[in-house]
Amino acid sequence: PSATYFVR
């Protein structure tokens, strides 16, 4: 889960 990344 992250604003920029799709991984986590």
Curated annotation (Swiss-Prot):
This is Unknown protein 4. It comes from Zinnia elegans.
